[in-house]
Amino acid sequence: MRKLSIPFLVASAMLVLGIVGGLACDERPERPIVHRAGYRVLEGDFHAHTAWSDGSLSPLGIVRQAARRGLDVVSITEHNTVLPSRAARWYAELTGGPIVITGEEVTTARFHVIALGIEHTVSPDQPLEDVISKIHSQHGIAIAAHPVQHFWPSVLPHRSEFDAAEVMHPIAYSERSADWRWADMVRFYEESPTPLGAIGSSDYHWMSVLGLCRTLLFVREPVSEAAVLEALREKHTVTIDREGKAYGDKALVAALRDEPYVPRTSDYAYRGSSTADRILRTLGWLGLLGVLLLRARAKTPELTPESPEPDS
């Protein structure tokens, strides 16, 4: 067994100290307790991706980012797998983070469906009606993800089978093309023959803002994962668009009109700002650099001069 050098041990200790100290100093904005219409109001984001596929953060990183962004509830909805969200829920329960609702984005070329409150992955290799049925068989919530015209041929015939639809989404701020328009998402929701829950989601990947679009949940106390899922099933949700218009349960929208509520979407600090935090993070980065350099140096073979050949 190769003996570890003192410089390597020092660099490793700096790295560990930086990680532990950075976590200890992490900003967690206060999430005030708010009531409207006899319910506790929570802010949630139900559409986020991780480095497992095309995101930038780990499931644990999403939980920490949700805490920094003042979210009460978050759901990791990775493409065609529920496993990252289960890891995030474990971490949130361990650290006292936001409530994590397990989820998956069932993703195909024809439709995208957010499945919330499930424990087992729902396969995308089946018709949409079967996808929704499999979600419901797990007592989950089926949400039409960004239902723009691009997906209408598949999702419109089954609109009444969904529990909810995304109404607010980053598409509202940057539309791609004629069949990816935010106005059509609103039409999908408003023209539904049966009421749908109104959802606001950030569809978080990378170089974006978690919690940019939020869902206001009207939850019965005590607050819990089960209470959040109950609010979603009962369609006790509201989302507010970029102009301040509210979509959702009419009685709850009226309650917000009588007593306005402004979602906490302003930017919070993404890291601690104290002197101790800066020192610890600097030590962590220096430690990481030291570990990488020392490992690279250890792998480089040493060149030794060739021994002279003996005289014949």
Please provide the spans of the model-predicted regions.
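Short, flexible loop segments at the rims of nucleotide/cofactor-binding pockets, characterized by
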Residues: 49-54, 118-122, 143-144, 173-177
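Charged catalytic cores and adjacent phosphate/nucleic-acid-binding surfaces used
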Residues: 2-44, 109-120, 150-312
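An N-terminally biased module of ancient metal coordination in phosphate/nucleic-acid-related enzymes
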Residues: 16-110, 306, 311
